[in-house]
């Protein structure tokens, strides 16, 4: 048992170390990119751990060993588009890990070889070599997958040096002088899966080179120019006819073709009868007329034809002829893009077309109208054309009974909902209507079994309630419209992917996730979210779903309103439940008011709060009135701050409470027993000292109303109040006086007590301080001549 366990443990250790080594290797990748930096030499400050070095598009003219000697970890070196003229491969002898070397688009004329075996990618194309730069050392590059060469002379002897290598792709760029000493069989020994030959771009194609390399699966020929009618593109047609010898050839690509219409049809006809299965022609310039001829569609291996970017002169022949050639091709896949095609005929019989792509043309929505011979068609792309009426497309699709995918995006389609039957083909599963002029009415007529629907970049403001019930719809893209809410899944019960970013969604429905139980991907970012109470539940629901469901969260989900929250991520947006729940807010306010009311009632009952409030108001009013009385009026002949009138029964309170608390602040109080002048009548003394006092204080109590002299003093003071218009009466209620106990002849006292505010003597000692402060404030004024005595009267 011990030995097997030890073996297992050892294997685990080895596996862990191997994984760690791989991880460290990946983490140690150091890529240095300095393209287009006007460098004339390889920089000297390169890090020693550099693994990828890109020095393309500079002015480097020389590469020395010392330039890269220290870069022992270098695996990728890109020096294309420089000015290298000479190269000694020995400069890489210390870069034993070098695998990728790109020296294309330089001025190399001479190359000196050195043994190297690690290269997988070597590109010497687009240089100034006379003969192909193939050394015998190249034969040792057993790992070589890509080889780019260039030269004006191609000799079999050079090619034989690498004939035994199984290279995935060979790029051969022929110089402008190619053809002077041409060896037609020079490529016979090339062993590669993909061969790309670039012919001289400015010369007529009059080459004898045999391009039918026996091992080639994919062949690409660039710069084909044959426009001279006397030759009829015979050289190139002869080269194509030899392709029939290579039974392995499956892919043929022609780039940058300039020829006549007749030669173009001849090229198609020759390729039609070769082993080629996939034929692509791009960047074509056509001229001249097209002579009528029958096209032979029989005996072909071709499955797909792609024609891209065609420029032609003004047609001088009926276009229907060329359209009929294309329409009746017996292939499965047909692509014509960027050809300015304005129409396409319906095949004359049931077509084998499975996939048709007419992207970027000038087709109208009348294309294939009433065509019943495309019943096998599965995919149709009419992207970037001149389609305007969706109803016509609907009627056309109805006859394509096998159509599963339709792309009519980037047109000017409208849907008027004008009563035309919604007759989409029942087989349609994928529909792309993006970048058109469609509104929400399009939802009333959609293929019933569609699974993927793309409506982004239209003019949809809302999804009508009476939409077509798309029970099979799984993916819906309505991005870049004007929708104001997330659509529910009532009509889309199988919806799993929704893209609705860049709309006008401000308050997403809180029940979206409840309605769309099958949603697994939601992209709703970059909308003008209004961060208010209505958004809280939606943000909360996002927190309940898996993070990978909401695409772009949280970076693409930010507040747009209010201004104070603009730019804030919805994840960081918070509002208190109190501000958003009306019931809770009402209950909280009611409870708060109740607590305040109870607290106020308690304060009133326990601390007699109303009394304090009244005293404070009186003190404030007194201070306010004092500031508005002219100083001259106050100081005219006053000798006392106050004249005090009280009953003899209350004298103890006056002497023990009132006088000590008022006279300690230099306040002069007039009492009759201290200041009345002997010999004068009592009435004369009362009148005289009331006039010499700033205020008259009356200490009211049940004893006061029983005193006759107190009544006189009150009468004269009240008379003085109305005579001079002053506010000199202060009433102190020492003890409560019931209204019924006041004699009828004391009508002035009744009037004063009912109209004027009086000070009520508090029985609680803690209130005495405020009482005396209020009283002092009401009588405290600066006297010009301070009386030496104090006047008070006792009755």
Curated annotation (Swiss-Prot):
Q: What does this protein do?
A: Participates in the innate immune response to microbial agents. Specifically recognizes diacylated and triacylated lipopeptides. Cooperates with TLR2 to mediate the innate immune response to bacterial lipoproteins or lipopeptides. Forms the activation cluster TLR2:TLR1:CD14 in response to triacylated lipopeptides, this cluster triggers signaling from the cell surface and subsequently is targeted to the Golgi in a lipid-raft dependent pathway. Acts via MYD88 and TRAF6, leading to NF-kappa-B activation, cytokine secretion and the inflammatory response.
Segments on the Extracellular side according to the record's topology features: 26-582
Where does the LRRCT domain start and stop, copy by copy?
524-579
Q: Which InterPro entries match?
A: Cys-rich_flank_reg_C, Leu-rich_rpt, Leu-rich_rpt_typical-subtyp, LRR_dom_sf, TIR_dom, Toll-like_receptor, Toll_tir_struct_dom_sf
The alphabetized list of GO BP terms reads: activation of NF-kappaB-inducing kinase activity; cellular response to triacyl bacterial lipopeptide; defense response; detection of triacyl bacterial lipopeptide; innate immune response; macrophage activation; microglial cell activation; positive regulation of interleukin-6 production
Kindly state which keywords UniProt assigns to this record, in alphabetical order: Cell membrane, Cytoplasmic vesicle, Disulfide bond, Glycoprotein, Golgi apparatus, Immunity, Inflammatory response, Innate immunity, Leucine-rich repeat, Membrane, NAD, Receptor, Repeat, Signal, Transmembrane, Transmembrane helix
Give GO terms: molecular function aspect only.
Answer: identical protein binding; NAD+ nucleosidase activity, cyclic ADP-ribose generating; Toll-like receptor 2 binding; transmembrane signaling receptor activity; triacyl lipopeptide binding
Name assigned to this protein: Toll-like receptor 1
* Locations listed in the record: Cell membrane; Cytoplasmic vesicle, Phagosome membrane; Membrane raft; Golgi apparatus
């Amino acid at each position: 048992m011990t030995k097997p366990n030890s073996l297992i443990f050892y294997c685990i250790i080895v596996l862990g170390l191997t994984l760690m080594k791989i991880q460290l290797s990946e983490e140690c990748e150091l890529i240095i990119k300095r393209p287009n930096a006007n460098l004339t030499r390889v920089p000297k400050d390169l890090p020693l751990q550099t693994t990828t070095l890109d020095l393309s598009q500079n002015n480097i003219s020389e590469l020395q060993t010392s330039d890269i000697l220290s870069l022992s970890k270098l695996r990728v070196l890109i020096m294309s588009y420089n000015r290298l003229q000479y190269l000694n491969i020995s400069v890489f002898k210390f870069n034993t890990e070098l695998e990728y070397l790109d020296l294309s688009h330089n001025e190399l004329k001479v190359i000196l070889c050195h043994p190297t075996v690690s290269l997988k990618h070597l590109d010497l194309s687009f240089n100034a070599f006379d003969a192909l730069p193939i050394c015998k050392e190249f034969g040792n590059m057993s790992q070589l997958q890509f080889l780019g060469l260039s030269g004006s002379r191609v000799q079999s002897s050079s090619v034989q040096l690498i004939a035994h290598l199984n290279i995935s792709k060979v790029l051969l760029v022929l110089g402008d002088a190619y053809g002077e000493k041409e060896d037609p069989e020079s490529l016979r020994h090339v062993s590669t899966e993909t061969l790309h030959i670039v012919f001289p771009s400015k010369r007529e194609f009059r080459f004898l080179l045999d391009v039918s390399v026996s091992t080639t699966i994919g062949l690409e020929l660039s710069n084909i120019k044959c426009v001279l009618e006397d030759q009829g593109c015979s050289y190139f047609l002869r080269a194509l006819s030899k392709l029939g010898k290579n039974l392995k050839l499956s892919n043929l690509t022609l780039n940058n073709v300039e020829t006549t219409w007749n030669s173009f049809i001849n090229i198609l006809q020759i390729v039609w009868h070769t082993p080629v299965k996939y034929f692509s022609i791009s960047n074509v310039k056509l001229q001249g007329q097209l002579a009528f001829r029958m096209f032979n569609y029989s005996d072909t291996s071709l499955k797909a034809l792609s024609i891209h970017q065609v420029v032609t002169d003004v047609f001088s022949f009926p276009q229907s002829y060329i359209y009929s050639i294309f329409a009746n091709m017996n292939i499965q896949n047909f692509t014509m893009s960027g050809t300015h095609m304005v129409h396409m005929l319906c095949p004359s019989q049931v077509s084998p077309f499975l996939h048709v792509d007419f992207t970027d043309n000038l087709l109208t929505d009348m294309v294939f109208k009433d065509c019943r011979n495309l019943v096998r068609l599965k995919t149709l792309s009419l992207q970037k054309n001149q389609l305007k009426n969706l109803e016509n497309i609907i009627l056309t699709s109805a006859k394509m009974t096998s159509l599963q995918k339709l792309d009519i995006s980037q047109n000017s389609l409208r849907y008027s909902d004008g009563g035309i039957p919604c007759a989409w083909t029942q087989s349609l599963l994928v529909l792309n209507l993006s970048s058109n002029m469609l509104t929400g009415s399009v939802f009333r007529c959609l293929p019933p079994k569609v699974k993927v629907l793309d409506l982004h970049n239209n003019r949809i403001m809302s999804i009508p309630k009476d939409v077509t019930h798309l029970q099979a719809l799984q993916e819906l893209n309505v991005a870049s419209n004007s929708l104001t809410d997330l659509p529910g899944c009532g009509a889309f019960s199988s919806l799993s992917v929704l893209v609705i970013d860049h709309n006008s969604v401000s308050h997403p429905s809180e029940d979206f996730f409840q309605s769309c139980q099958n949603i697994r991907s939601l992209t709703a970012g970059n909308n003008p979210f209004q961060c208010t109470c209505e958004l809280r539940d939606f943000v909360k629901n996002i927190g309940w779903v898996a993070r990978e469901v909401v695409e772009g969260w949280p970076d693409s989900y930010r507040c747009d309103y209010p201004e104070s929250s603009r730019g804030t991520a919805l994840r960081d947006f918070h509002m208190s439940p109190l501000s958003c729940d009306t019931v809770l807010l009402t209950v909280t306010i009611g409870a708060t008011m109740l607590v305040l009311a109870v607290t106020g009632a308690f304060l009133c009952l326990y601390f007699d709060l109303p009394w304090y409030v009244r005293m404070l108001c009186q003190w404030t009013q007194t201070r306010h009135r004092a500031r508005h009385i002219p100083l001259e009026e106050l100081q005219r002949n006053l000798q006392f701050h106050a004249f005090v009138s009280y009953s003899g029964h209350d004298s103890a309170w006056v002497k023990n409470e009132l006088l000590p608390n008022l006279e300690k602040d230099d306040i002069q109080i007039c009492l009759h027993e201290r200041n009345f002048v002997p010999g004068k009548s009592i009435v004369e003394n009362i009148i005289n000292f009331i006039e010499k006092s700033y205020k008259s204080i009356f200490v009211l109590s049940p004893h006061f109303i029983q005193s006759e002299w107190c009544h006189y003093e009150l009468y004269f003071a009240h008379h003085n109040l109305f005579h001079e218009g002053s506010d000199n009466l202060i009433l102190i209620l020492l003890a409560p006086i019931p209204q019924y106990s006041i004699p009828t002849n004391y009508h002035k006292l009744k009037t004063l007590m009912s109209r004027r505010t009086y000070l009520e003597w508090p029985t609680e000692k803690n209130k005495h301080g405020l009482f005396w402060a209020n009283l002092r404030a009401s009588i405290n004024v600066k006297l010009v001549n301070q009386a030496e005595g104090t006047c008070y009267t006792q009755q």
